[in-house]
A protein has these predicted regions:
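Amphipathic alpha-helical packing segments from all-alpha helical-bundle domains
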Residues: 109-135, 143-151, 175-178
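Alpha-helical DNA-contacting segments of helix-turn-helix folds
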Residues: 53-61, 103, 119
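Amphipathic alpha-helical linker/stalk segments
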Residues: 59-82, 114-118, 129
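Hydrophobic alpha-helical connector segments
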Residues: 70-99, 142, 146-149
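Amphipathic alpha-helical segments used for helix-helix packing
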Residues: 94-110, 158-162
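Helix-turn-helix
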Residues: 12, 20-52, 56
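Generic hydrophobic, amphipathic alpha-helix propensity
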Residues: 8-17, 32, 57-61, 65, ...
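C-terminal peripheral helix-coil segments that are non-catalytic and often amphipathic
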Residues: 125-133, 162-217
Length: 217
């Protein structure tokens, strides 16, 4: 009778690989399992080899992003909803910078392309709500707006994660996103209020350790 796979072993190896990326350690079959208590055979059992490890790492970034989206409470304000979505994207990148980098490594195949692409649909749905509520022009494609706000957030957090700029740069998300959504047809004052609310929605309460992950200072 074949032994059942233990999900904890798979998670352990993925987390070790992510940690090795963070510490700039070369990842090989032997170095990956070193100190884990499992043999090199586990890499083949759970991933089919090192190529599978890289695919799983890339997929894991999208999996965690999707899980974060699932925790969001949908507000009545559709613009706040849209911005809260990209704020969640930013926080996910800040909390998992190594997985974030691998997410966009096109040289590595994804395990589930559709699941990865589905993460964008959260933003598309929110952008569609904006149009239905009359906050943006009726002739504007929600997919276009979703891509525009994602591009802004991706650019900002990429600079921060790569340490080109400090976390103070995150504060620029408010005026930049406001400009994008106002250009799409929203009222400037209402838009600013909604963007500020959405951008702040993912900040943990004061006193929690996670506060450091979302601080703009």
């Amino acid at each position: 009778m074949a032994r059942q796979k233990d999900p904890a072993v798979r998670t352990q190896l993925l987390e070790r690989a992510a940690r090795m990326l963070r510490e700039r350690e070369p990842i090989t079959l032997r170095s990956l399992v070193e100190g884990t208590g499992v043999s090199t055979m586990a890499v083949y059992t759970y991933f089919g080899g090192m190529d599978g490890v890289w695919r799983a790492l890339r997929q894991e970034g999208f999996t965690r992003l999707a899980a974060r989206f699932e925790t969001l409470t949908v507000p009545d304000d559709p613009v706040e909803d849209l911005v809260a979505g990209v704020a969640a994207y930013v926080v996910n990148a800040l909390e998992h910078p190594d997985l974030y980098r691998v997410m966009f490594d096109a040289t590595v195949e994804l395990e589930d392309v559709e699941a990865a692409e589905a993460t964008l649909q959260y933003l598309v749905r929110a952008a569609r709500r904006c149009r239905e509520a009359g906050r943006i022009r009726e002739d504007l494609d929600p997919v276009l707006l979703a891509n525009e706000v994602w591009t802004v957030s991706h650019g900002i957090v990429s600079l921060v994660v790569s340490r080109v700029t400090s976390r103070r740069t995150l504060a620029s998300g408010i005026p930049l996103l406001t400009a994008v959504i106002v250009a799409a047809g929203d009222d400037p004052a209402a838009c600013r209020r909604s963007v500020e609310a959405g951008w702040a929605a993912l900040r943990p309460p004061q006193g929690r350790t996670a506060m450091a992950s979302t601080s703009t200072t």
